[in-house]
Amino acid sequence: MDINASRALANVYDLPDDFFPKIDDLVRDAKDALEPYWKSDSIKKHVLIATHFVDLIEDFWQTTQGMHEIAESLRAVIPPTTAPVPTGYLIQHEEAEEIPLGDLFKHQEERIVSFQPDYPITARIHAHLKAYAKINEESLDRARRLLWWHYNCLLWGEANVTNYISRLRTWLSTPEKYRGRDAPTIEAITRPIQVAQGGRKTSSGTRKPRGLEPRRRKVKTTVVYGRRRSKSRDRRAPSPQRAGSPLPRSSSSHHRSPSPRK
């Protein structure tokens, strides 16, 4: 990956959350884009990475949705006087990356006890589920952005997606009164430029060479007695006879020559 594409990929994390499709729509669009490559058993980089994130997102998404459903169902059995665990006592995504997966439950339980030692068991389970679901959602968000990048590189080409991210970032960072009303779209960037017809006349046939050519003098000719005669050389008055008709004989030619037989 060249430096421009690497920079554009890093900028994907800074794009607004609502720029990306919802998880269900994203996975469906990605599968549609990947299907031709799956049929041909392609091993392109973008195909392999996008396939990995499709599987990862589907598994994480289902697990996260299940956590939310169980947590909501536990609300009915939590004592109404129980205060929710403050956000500061819940493990955040950045902290979870530094903690081994097997120790995640232990660290979260210690924080809940430090908040309230006799915290009800149902409320503890609810707090655990909410913390893990939040961690999963942030991981899903990162995976969602990466999946969007890789399957769009398959659809539009890595260079076009890189150019699009650069233009979109420029548009977002420009004050509203100095930028266009609508954000740039990748469809508009990749659309071929059409030249208006009729603006210039096109000549068919052989192409004339460039540069100046010496002008050739045109010599007008006429035909007299089947021969070509240059008008530039003969400036005499025109004959009343038509071209190609016999000229009248002179008076001396009217006398018939004696026959050689006499």
UniProtKB/Swiss-Prot annotation:
UniProt keyword terms in alphabetical order: Capsid protein, Cytoplasmic inwards viral transport, DNA-binding, Host cytoplasm, Host-virus interaction, Microtubular inwards viral transport, Phosphoprotein, RNA-binding, T=4 icosahedral capsid protein, Viral penetration into host nucleus, Virion, Virus entry into host cell
Gene Ontology molecular functions: DNA binding; RNA binding; structural molecule activity
GO terms under cellular component: host cell; host cell cytoplasm; T=4 icosahedral viral capsid
Signal peptide location: none
Entry keyword RNA-binding: yes
Record PTM Phosphoserine, positions in chain: S232, S239, S245
Gene3D superfamilies xrefs: Viral capsid, core domain supefamily, Hepatitis B virus
Role: Self assembles to form an icosahedral capsid. Most capsid appear to be large particles with an icosahedral symmetry of T=4 and consist of 240 copies of capsid protein, though a fraction forms smaller T=3 particles consisting of 180 capsid proteins. Entering capsid are transported along microtubules to the nucleus. Phosphorylation of the capsid is thought to induce exposure of nuclear localization signal in the C-terminal portion of the capsid protein that allows binding to the nuclear pore complex via the importin (karyopherin-) alpha and beta.
Subunit structure: Homodimerizes, then multimerizes.
Similarity comment text for this entry: Belongs to the avihepadnavirus core antigen family.
Name listed for the protein in its UniProt record: Capsid protein
Lineage start: Viruses, Riboviria, Pararnavirae, Artverviricota, Revtraviricetes
